[in-house]
Regions:
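Divalent-metal coordination cores built from histidine and acidic residues
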Residues: 7-10, 89-198
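Divalent metal-coordination and catalytic microenvironments
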Residues: 24, 44, 67, 78, ...
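Short acidic loop-to-helix transition motifs that present clustered carboxylates
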Residues: 55, 207-211
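Di-metal (Zn2+ and/or Mg2+/Mn2+) metal-binding site signature of metallo-dependent hydrolases
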Residues: 68-91
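Short, intrinsically disordered, charge-balanced linker/junction segments flanking boundaries
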Residues: 214-221
Length: 221
């Protein structure tokens, strides 16, 4: 992690950049433009983007990007790493070369099999990777109470505790949307635990509309 002062000085040209990505094009996702630009890196941060290469950036190292387009890292906002049948480190190796730099995972599959220990494993196995991994805590463990044999049951109190863990940003897809709409005690408590913690509630309500959709949204999803 670089200091803020160092980053400012690098942007102003008062200290050398660590890396200059030179000769490529840049996709501006705000304006839709593609234009020539050199990119100056200091530490692990972008210090400066030199549109049209007017500033003649210099750095300790250079990467020649001619023929390439620089784009922001892709963010996959919902993924089940377990479905890929690989561990988080192997998943990172697979997706990083194609531009995905951040994922938000819902580990409800391993949670339904292995319970809290499964969520802890996913948290630890994704720590320190070059891929940024954020977690949401499964709201449906078991997925269909009374219809299946799951490895655990996550009540609101369990979810509330796991929401305090690092890199946890929300409650995963609230698949029991009838329970949310009807405000059953268990699902209402799970939603309230997420809201009380200041976290996002992720929706999952296929084909729901009208008053039911309005009620689902009114519940905080």
């Amino acid at each position: 992690m670089v200091s803020r002062t160092g980053l400012v000085e690098a942007a102003r040209g008062q200290r050398p950049l660590d890396l200059v990505i030179r000769g490529g094009l840049l996709l501006n996702v705000y304006t839709g433009e593609v234009y020539p630009a050199d990119i100056g890196i200091y530490g692990d941060r972008i210090a400066i983007v030199d549109r049209d290469r007017r500033l003649g950036l210099q750095g300790r190292n250079e990467f020649q990007a001619r023929g390439h387009i620089a784009v922001p890292g892709f963010i996959d906002t919902h993924v089940h790493i377990e479905s890929t049948m690989v561990t988080p480190p192997h998943f990172a190796r697979a997706v990083l070369p194609f531009g995905t730099t951040t994922v938000v995972i819902d580990p409800h599959e391993i949670g339904n099999v292995y319970g809290r220990a499964g969520i802890e494993y996913m948290l630890k196995a994704s720590e320190g990777l070059p891929l940024r991994v954020y977690l949401t805590i499964p709201s449906s463990v078991p997925a269909v109470p009374g219809l299946e044999t799951a490895g655990a049951v996550f009540e609101a109190s369990d979810i509330a505790e796991m929401l305090t863990w690092p890199r946890v940003i929300g409650v995963a897809e609230l698949m029991d949307y009838p329970g949310i709409i009807q405000q059953t005690p268990r699902m209402a408590a799970i939603a309230e635990a997420g809201l009380r913690a200041g976290k996002r509630l992720e929706g999952h309500a296929p084909l729901v509309g009208g008053r039911d959709l309005a009620a689902y949204l009114a519940a905080g999803v």
